[in-house]
Regions:
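Beta1/beta-strand and adjacent pyrophosphate-binding region of the FAD-binding site
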Residues: 1-15, 35-37
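Residue-level preference for short coil/turn positions at secondary-structure junctions
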Residues: 3-5, 10, 30, 113, ...
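Residue-level preference for alpha-helix termini and adjacent loops
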Residues: 13, 50, 66, 87-90
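Conserved N-terminal helical subregion
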Residues: 73-136
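Short, Lys/Arg-enriched, disordered terminal segments
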Residues: 1-5, 25-31, 106, 132
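N-terminal FAD cofactor-binding segment of flavoenzymes
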Residues: 18, 22-77, 95
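Aromatic side chains
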Residues: 5-7, 51, 88, 136
Length: 136
């Protein structure tokens, strides 16, 4: 049986959850039905994600550590440089994933399922996502 959604996100880790979070925060999507398909929701990745970013952003709630200076150090040279506009930030994946999933699970227009995506059938006006247990 085919179940219809306006948007389907395949994968619920870093890139999928960043996309889902941006959709969640955008009122243009309030009347859209969004499905997130993830093969294994019970085992969140235990990783750290690091990135460069301007001082303040919407990701700061998830940042566990940040650096505002660089140190170049060798036996013959040492230089510490302060980063003016950017900082290097670190997020722990487990906290990020749990926080975003909790927010999305409480939304009326998001559905999260655990299933294995097998493939896609694309036509002119739609895409069918085939999983082990269904078609969307």
């Amino acid at each position: 049986m085919k179940i219809k959604y306006d948007y389907i996100i395949c994968g619920a880790w870093l890139s999928g959850l960043i996309l889902a979070n941006k959709i969640f925060e955008d009122s243009d999507f309030d009347n859209k039905q969004i499905l997130i398909i993830e093969k294994n929701l019970s085992d969140p990745l235990n990783k750290t994600w690091c990135f460069w970013e301007k001082k303040n952003s919407s990701w700061d709630d998830y940042v566990i550590k940040s650096w505002d200076k660089l140190l170049f150090n060798s036996p013959n040279f040492k230089n510490e440089t302060f980063l003016s506009e950017y900082s290097y930030k670190m997020i722990k994946s487990e906290f990020f994933i749990k926080s975003i999933l909790q927010k999305i699970r409480n939304s009326k227009n998001f559905k999260i399922i655990e299933d294995d995506v097998l493939g896609f059938d694309e036509s002119k006006d739609r895409v069918i996502v085939k999983t082990k247990s269904n078609k969307y």
